[in-house]
């Protein structure tokens, strides 16, 4: 088994070299073929997904799968439309490979170029969501990266069907290398993949807190991702109530099973009585379980609102991924910021305010990869950020942070163009000086 896995990885690694230099025209043709194949093979995809949903239903009954994961697993015609739209958006994006990032003259006829290039071979390990396959494959293809996919067993039929449809489309496109995209399906294969740091350049895990943490703790391969999505909205005393009601409702209810839905609502005490009862009523009508701190519980109970639960200290650190929301009253914006930076996951947090200085303070001090002002946290998404699609959301403080699109799948190399220069001429008593002059030159224009 392990030898078979290594064979797949070595094959993908070799193909990654060829893929890195495929032209934009060929890559776009392959992407078009992917989109057309998804549209043509809808029936096969939905049939495979129905098998997974039956299996997932059994897992849920015995407590091995949450409703949130079941929701993410479901594929519909509209979700297939979304997969296709995401691929078409990637086609519209400019080829990011070979872009000149900077040009520096070291001396006459000694020019240093910094250009973008693919990372190489990326491993993507994910739970439940079959739409990850076309999202990530399209971005990796356009950015010239070979990819190993490993999905959860609960989505095995969907993942395999979608993967095979897409790979057939890619490999039937003239000029595309074969073997650049591989699929792994067993838990044992994950452990083998995690040990192949000699071949795999980056891992992108997508799933629960425990899942991502497990990946991080069991590999030497660099990992890009986030362990949880504990997101907040702070309703400031200078908030417009209508804006706050609308935004806070969307941020929890529109799709609670995802990592950019809020888990805690922080409300300034000065606006609480005017804002919170109506907000709570909206949530309760939508089926949201409210877990309130002492003061918000008293306020809402006195208004006759129910059902209400009392929040525990543990609730501030929980990612529910469900119709559950913690509520806390705060005295100041500083208290709200301190709470977010203490209990949040540095994913996405927002403020509702009409006060410019409060807005500036929140943006400057909240340590999150995305900060929303008078807008729903649900906008924190690669597609909505105009990236075509996303490979994931990173809370790491590395080269990629927030929703990661193609730019997060690129690194750079330096190319020095000279005419016989040697370091000896720039060292010693009669050393020539470096000019270190920035130039507006593109490497693509070099003859």
Swiss-Prot record:
Superkingdom as given in the UniProt entry: Archaea
Pathway: Amino-acid biosynthesis; L-proline biosynthesis; L-glutamate 5-semialdehyde from L-glutamate: step 2/2
Record keywords: Amino-acid biosynthesis, Cytoplasm, NADP, Oxidoreductase, Proline biosynthesis
EC number(s) from the headed UniProt entry: 1.2.1.41
Catalytic activity line of the entry: L-glutamate 5-semialdehyde + phosphate + NADP(+) = L-glutamyl 5-phosphate + NADPH + H(+)
Pfam families attached to this UniProt entry: Aldedh
Example GO molecular function: NADP binding
GO cellular component, one term: cytoplasm
Subcellular location: Cytoplasm
One of the GO biological process terms: L-proline biosynthetic process
NCBIfam families hit by this protein: PRK00197.1, proA
Family: Belongs to the gamma-glutamyl phosphate reductase family.
Function: Catalyzes the NADPH-dependent reduction of L-glutamate 5-phosphate into L-glutamate 5-semialdehyde and phosphate. The product spontaneously undergoes cyclization to form 1-pyrroline-5-carboxylate.
Name of the protein in question: Gamma-glutamyl phosphate reductase
